Amino acid sequence: MRLSSIKLAGFKSFVDPTHFQVPGQLVGVVGPNGCGKSNIIDAVRWVLGESRASELRGESMQDVIFNGSTTRKPGSRASVELIFDNSDGRAAGQWGQYGEIAVKRVLTRDGTSSYYINNLPARRRDIQDIFLGTGLGPRAYAIIGQGMIARIIEAKPEELRVFLEEAAGVSKYKERRRETENRLHDTRENLTRVEDIVRELGANLEKLEAQAVVATKYKELVADGEEKQRLLWLLRKNEAAAEQDRQRRAIGDAQIELDAQTAKLREVEAQLETLRVAHYSASDAMQGAQGALYEANAEVSRLEAQIKFIVESRNRVQAQIAALVAQQEQWRAQADKAQGDLEVAEEARAVADEKAAIAEDDAAAKHDALPALEARWRDAQTGLNDERGRIAQTEQALKLEAAHQRNADQQLQQLQQRHERLKVEAGGLDAPDEAQLEELRMQLAEHEAMLAEAQARLADAQEALPRLDAQRRAAHERVQAESAQIHQLEARLAALKQLQENVQTQGKIQPWLDKHELGALPRLWKKLHVEAGWETALEAVLRERLAALEVSNLDWVKAFATDAPPAKLAFYAPPAAGEPLAAPGALRPLLPLVRIDDAGLRAVLNDWLGTVFVADDLAQALAARMQLPQGGAFVVKAGHVVTRSGVQLYAADSEQAGMLARAQEIENLTRQVRAQALLSDEAKAAAIRAEAAHTQASQALTEVRAQAERATQRVHALQMDVLKLTQAHERYTQRSTQIREELEEIGAQIEEQRALRAESEANFERHDAELAELQARFEDNQLAFESLDETLTNARQEARERERAATDARFAARQSANRIDELKRSIQVAHEQAERVAASLEDARAELETINEQTAHTGLQDALEVRAAKEQALGAARAELDDLTAKLRAADEARLAAERSLQPLRDRITELQLKEQAARMTGEQFAEQLATAEVDEAALKEKLMPDMKPSYLQGEVTRINNAINALGPVNMAALDELAAASERKVFLDAQSADLTNAIETLEDAIRKIDQETRALLQATFDEVNRHFSDLFPRLFGGGQAKLIMTGDEILDAGVQVMAQPPGKKNATIHLLSGGEKALTATALVFAMFQLNPAPFCLLDEVDAPLDDANTERFANLVRAMSDKTQFLFISHNKIAMEMAQQLIGVTMQEQGVSRIVAVDMETAAGFAQN
């Protein structure tokens, strides 16, 4: 594996796409300081995955992108590509099969960094994996930059161990150990989290158990509280209805009293209206008299104002006449002055017009001469520009031909080198095995068919499993439902049986029965079976006889006369069977509704029930009671008894109430339990079958999935083998064809380049002669053009001066004309104003003659007499109005008193209405609450006892609420959460065990990796130490050196260098000179190379601190090691340059831009010498 070429674009100073070959084993890079040589080393380190900008001599990673120069803009991306010849297959991983490997990295300004391998997107990790164990990497010992030699020899022991590990090739072991430690760390963290969760879950389970108890108590309290609250609502609703009725009656009484008071008010209002009409009439008369007085006063005022106006008008007209005479004299004087100024202005305009005409003629003459001069100037300039363009074209042609010659030389050299490489590569190509490829394809087809079959079976199994799972869940749900149903029926049956048992064994009568040993006797009700619905009717008729005890002879009951039972008790003895009594008419007897198996018992019931008949309801019984025989009775389903002369309403008042109904229900429930048990057994059998089918399908799915995975893995493996061989065959065919075509193309290109170079030399000579002729002619034309340009400039200046003089003259003439027009307008205005003032003067004199005061004084005396008469009439009208106003005020006060008496009544009615409305709203509120709760009010009323008070119910609700509040926060989902938490704890316990096993497995793997790494490192240390001891004397001409381990454990111990040149006994290497340190570091690096030679090595001015003798020894050692390792070195030393097989020159002719140039070996040596 060797480096064959490097491509750079936009990386640091290599802004243009640059591609240079690395053909030999010793390639030197030369050039002046600062031209960008070290950027090549940075580029290689960068593309191998370097992520620290400081290692690339920058502050941020964007610094590797070209940042612009004085003539170029900054670049937007940087790209570096390394092309390796992998014909020996040394590359690691899947890329080892490729003969050529191209590693590429691209970085853009937005920070996006991309890696590619053979133009396929890859990760940074993938690129590093290729070079694991080869000594290559962003900071490996195979890339030695400026100052790195000193850092190696002066590195800390722990840092120096890193180079030893790279030489040993344990990078992959360390990577595996790091990944294993990461997984171990993650597993331990997961185990810790699981254990924390388990502990937390255990505490949570205890809380949930306590919460479940509280939730059950909470439900009981809530149910009791809801019942008490609804009873309270119903009681409040009834009280609100009663209060509403009381308030309605009070409102009616108050309304009657209000109507009486209102009638009195209407009488007072009628009297008030009569007085108000009279008052309106008197008020109108008074207002008429006052209006007449106002008119008389107005006439007096008008005449007085008229007299005052006449006097003021006479004075005003006299003043106006005097002012108009003065204005008339002023306008006449202004017209005379303007006429004199007009004559002077006309003379000035004539002079200005004459001067303007002369100046315009001079300016026109100068402008007419300019076009000819300008045309000559433009012709001369065009000719001069054409000459300049031809010179520039000729110079460009010369440069182009020179570049063509250099390019042709470079192309010829590169083509010849590539021709030789292609010949060598063609001879080393190996044809792939066709038979093996065909065999792999047949195996692949066979396994793909097997995979398709397995995938089909897997799809069928995956499709069937959800269906079976649904069937299984449905079966289990049915089992649960049937079990719940049977449990419910059994619980109901047990409750009824217990109730029946309690009825028999509890109460006042039982101790008496036990005392007389009668407790074992059968009760009557156990032998009776009544038609459904008539149980209560039979109980109402038989009453205490329903629990009668059967005895063989009634005579011995006489013994209980002295020791009577504490409650009613009946005995019966079955007589001889008799015929039942016939029912009169259409009456239905009760006895046929009772099913009795015992004939003797039937005779007893015939005696007790012979005259008892049934009716559907109480109304029917009452209607037909006269049809009853003597001593007969009707009984209805509700238990009410109707005789010919009375009605007995039934109520449960004994312990035996409802025993027949309960017995009937017990019998029905017993049958239902047996039927439900059969259904439950059937559901359990179906669930077992469904569970077995699901388990079988699940196992089959697991087996089919495993088969499909094995088939998939085998198919993938065969696909990779086929792909490798196919790609190898394609690469062989493609590369063979490509080499043949390239060789033909290169031969043609070589001939073409030679012909182009000869043609370029001829063109260069021709263009050189043309350039000399053009430059001579250009100098002559340049002088003639400068003279013409000066003449044209002077002519333009003189024309501009003449034009300015003409412009000034025209402006003076226009000013004179404007002055004349203005004076004419002033004269016309003065005449017009004088005429207008004369007309106004005539009008004012005529107005003065029309003014007369005597007529106005006579009219004023008459108006004063009329006003006095109007004042007397107004006084009489005002006296009449004041009298009516006093009467109207008295009547209005009476009306107000009546209205004030009405207001308390209205307030009382309003208050009563508010109370009635409040009662109605309260009732509606409680009715709405009952409706919202969907309460059956009829059933609720039966629970409402007469002695229940709202305070009692409110106290009960408060007590229950306090009990609920005392429970604190209640988790209603505690029961469900408890089941879920228990199930989760079982799962977490299993997961904790799995994680513990995984930790043990990972720890075993780490111990195995450490064991292998320790052995490999020890062997490497011994081997490097041996090579180091051999190479050090070769570079120094004697002396000794060795490596020392600073610790007992090689995995974490440091490495220290001990070096003593000939004749020195120094204790540490820090006492050596700079050159000695450099040689020591070089010996150490090359010792690592001999152990694990890297494909190539980059040296950046490593020989800088060495003198000529040491440089010679260094060069000899590098030359000897180049048999196994390719060296690319940067140097300014002539001795180092001489050992190179090829030289690559780096130049910076354009500031800030690096380019690659061909370098002659002798020129380079002379450059280094200078």
Curated annotation (Swiss-Prot):
Coiled-coil region: 169-215, 245-365, 401-508, 664-944, 983-1020
Protein name: Chromosome partition protein Smc
CC annotations in GO: chromosome; cytoplasm
Residue pairs linked by disulfide bridges in the UniProt entry: none
Organism the protein comes from: Burkholderia pseudomallei (strain 1710b)
Family: Belongs to the SMC family.
Gene that specifies this protein: smc
Compartments in which it is found: Cytoplasm
A Pfam family of this chain: SMC_N
